Curated annotation (Swiss-Prot):
Role according to the record: Nuclear factor which might have a role in spermatogenesis.
Upper classification of the organism: Eukaryota, Metazoa, Chordata, Craniata, Vertebrata
Organism: Mus musculus
Coarse class of the protein's main subcellular location: nucleus
Subcellular location: Nucleus
GO cellular component terms listed in the entry, alphabetical order: nucleus
Tissue: Specific to testis, where it is expressed in spermatogonia.
Compositionally biased intervals (Basic residues): 73-83
Chain intervals for the UniProt region annotation (Disordered): 69-101, 117-144, 275-298
Keyword annotations of the record: Nucleus
Protein name according to UniProt: Protein Tex24
Biased composition, class Basic and acidic residues, residue ranges: 275-285
């Protein structure tokens, strides 16, 4: 009897420890899911302890944890719970680690909560592996998929917002540094080199390149870099103008060496260079010597108007035989040829 009383007290202590552990688990689950009345009702059922147990024979019907009324789901299902049999009759202590715990699980799908008897997990056996229903696994998969979709959507929205902020920070128009004609440069356009800018400045269509805004330097360059760039461009521009003037002067001098095109060549050279050409003293000496040997120009012939002056006179060789015969017969001394080609005979006064 002493051993049986010890075994009964041991079982009571063990039952109380199991109840306290279940209460801790239920406190954790109730913090995540509100209104878990079903789980608390199961714990109340577990707390029911028989008033007196005089003996633990196999002949007397035993009231174990599995035989307690299960009012959690409205029906009693003793077949779903394993029976815990005492081993005090066999003469050895009971199993100190009985693996029996009933946890009612609530599955979250987004904002809705699904609960039911099929969602309950029962941990049975020494390994303690859970037996999860297929509906519970499908719900967990859908919940994970939903969370991943929400995370991806939030990440995309953050990227869009960052891109919009970057675009707003960029300036609307950037001005390319140029001391004579500042021009607009598009955001996606590559910077123009100095050689390309000079080629476009000397020849080409410059419409639409002059900006209407006041001139300003780019913010990317420092003060020292800006000064150096302006000095270099100004010196190179002056050098290019000097080379161009020198070439035009050489062309003008070559044109002036030809006597027939001297005057025309000088005019062309002056027109091209837009400034007076100053030839050297040697060229001036040669030009004066050539002018002395230049032949005088012939007077320009006037145009003959037939309506006013008539047909021009054609001079032919006089036929003396015909004239002598006319003088003999008519006795005229002189023949006057008019402009019309008619011949008139003039008689002498004494004849």
């Amino acid at each position: 009897m002493g051993s049986q009383s010890l075994n009964s007290t041991f079982l009571k202590v063990r039952r109380l420890s199991l109840i306290s552990s279940n209460e801790r688990l239920l406190g954790q689950t109730s913090g995540l899911a509100t209104g878990s009345r079903l789980v608390t009702q199961e714990v109340d059922d577990l707390r029911v302890i028989p008033g007196s147990r005089p003996d633990l024979d196999d002949h007397q019907p035993q009231c174990s944890l599995a035989e307690l009324p299960s009012t959690a789901h409205g029906k009693r299902k003793p077949g779903h719970l394993p029976r815990l049999r005492s081993s005090a009759v066999k003469g050895h202590a009971p199993d100190p680690n009985p693996s029996l715990s009933i946890v009612s699980k609530r599955i979250f799908k987004g904002e809705s909560v699904i609960k039911g008897p099929e969602d309950r997990q029962t941990f049975v056996g020494p390994s303690g592996l859970p037996k999860i229903s297929p509906k519970a696994t499908a719900g967990e998969a859908q919940g994970k998929k939903r969370t991943m979709e929400l995370l991806n959507k939030a990440r995309k929205q953050e990227e869009k917002v960052s891109n919009l902020l970057d675009i707003r920070q960029l300036p609307k128009q950037e001005v390319f540094i140029n001391n004579t004609h500042p021009c607009k440069k598009h955001l996606k356009q590559q910077p123009m080199s100095l050689e390309e800018w000079r080629r476009g400045h000397l020849g080409g269509d410059n419409t639409g390149l002059i900006s209407q805004e006041p001139f300003r330097c780019c913010k990317r360059l420092g003060k020292k870099a800006q000064c150096q760039l302006l000095e270099v461009t100004s010196l190179e521009a002056e050098a290019s103008l000097e080379v161009l003037k020198r070439r035009r002067r050489m062309q003008a001098m070559e044109m002036s060496k030809k006597p027939q095109d001297r005057g025309l060549g000088q005019e062309k050279a002056v027109f091209l260079s837009r400034e007076k050409v100053k030839p050297s003293s040697h060229d001036m000496h040669l030009s004066t010597a050539e002018r002395s040997f230049k032949p005088k120009s012939m007077p320009k012939a006037e145009d003959w108007d037939l309506s006013v002056q008539g047909t021009p006179v054609v001079l032919t060789v006089r036929d003396h035989s015909n004239v002598s015969q006319a003088q003999k017969h008519l006795g005229c001394a002189e023949i006057f040829h008019s402009r019309d080609g008619r011949c008139t005979l003039l008689k002498r006064g004494g004849a």
